[in-house]
Amino acid sequence: MNLHEYQAKSLFAEYGLPVSEGFACDTAQEAVEAAGHIGGNLWVVKCQVHAGGRGKAGGVKVTGNKDEIRAFAENWLGKNLVTYQTDAKGQPVAKILVESCTDIANELYLGAVVDRSTRRVVFMASTEGGVDIETVAEHTPELIHTAIIDPLTGPQAFQARDLGFKLGLNPTQMKQFTKIFMGLANMFNDHDFALLEINPLVITTEGNLHCLDGKIGIDGNALFRQPKIKAMHDPSQDDAREAHAAKFELNYVALDGNVGCMVNGAGLAMGTMDIVNLHGGKPANFLDVGGGATKERVAEAFKIILSDSNVKAVLVNIFGGIVRCDMIAEGIIGAVKEVGVKVPVVVRLEGTNAELGREVLAKSGLDIIAATSLTDAAEQVVKAAEGK
């Protein structure tokens, strides 16, 4: 689960981090009133969506004119913002963040992630702020400095000072950076973050550190113990099919291809997508039906896959372990009849009662292609998607 920038900054403020005065507005009139409440003669207005690249897409504007604030809000509220991080449809804009403008002397980067290799929270800092950290990591990795947080001792001030020295901060800024670092580390732990970024963390013309942006990703598995964070969820930013799938405990991720994939097990699902790609196809989705591949769940999975008009064929790849393949086959048949599938369906069954499952499919009288292996399944579904 991701948070909006205004939500992230609200958390920053709770932990004493320096952020701009700002208001998240639902209407153009609120945006104009927010500028008046903030005061000054220069403001920043930002579309609130779960995606980066807003500035390049026209979703951020610096202005000293309240009429321009009104026009910006009227233009974007209720519309979709398309950036390089969204799909072609973009993300809906339901709120506009109006903030005081900050004079910038320099831009830094500060972020943290859960590193699987060390099984620790790792902080990253760089003098290359304001650009994608992935780009920095690819071209100038030596400019990224790290600090690994030991879960037994927690964040330490000396780690902040070490990063601060590498960023070239002066003594005053070092104290500010240490406070920011410690606050973020505690926040990361308290609220079960999976990702945290301040990009950029700026040095103002007065020489002070300031959190100009905020990006937070939450560990979805921990939401049961984070009711406050869970209440911040904005369902409008979710893919409609992914949200529907979650109601049935189906793990679904929409992609751009034309081969629908229905698989039990995340690892097998990724392997299935790989082999479809290997044979010249493009997966339309990742869909893991999990261990309980019942008729009802399979039917919902078909409905979700076929709600994508780009899908030209469906590959069902099931390994029967605890669940028997003959039962899965009956579920597939029932689902195909219920949903009224109009595209070719290729089914590969392996595991417990796999042969019996294939017999059940063959006797169904439905236009279901039974594959003998995963390679055969991939070849057949790619041909079917191409109309061959």
Curated annotation (Swiss-Prot):
Binding site for Mg(2+): 199, 213
Enzyme class: ligase
Catalytic activity, as annotated: succinate + ATP + CoA = succinyl-CoA + ADP + phosphate; GTP + succinate + CoA = succinyl-CoA + GDP + phosphate
Pathway, per record: Carbohydrate metabolism; tricarboxylic acid cycle; succinate from succinyl-CoA (ligase route): step 1/1
Cofactor note (record): Binds 1 Mg(2+) ion per subunit.
Gene Ontology molecular-function annotations: ATP binding; magnesium ion binding; succinate-CoA ligase (ADP-forming) activity; succinate-CoA ligase (GDP-forming) activity
Listed GO CC annotations: cytosol; succinate-CoA ligase complex
Domain ATP-grasp: 9-244
SUPFAM superfamilies hit by this protein: Glutathione synthetase ATP-binding domain-like, Succinyl-CoA synthetase domains
Cofactor(s) required, per the database record: Mg(2+)
Pfam families according to UniProt: ATP-grasp_2, Ligase_CoA
Homology family: Belongs to the succinate/malate CoA ligase beta subunit family.
Subunit structure: Heterotetramer of two alpha and two beta subunits.
NCBIfam families, A to Z: PRK00696.1, sucCoAbeta
Name of the protein in its database record: Succinate--CoA ligase [ADP-forming] subunit beta
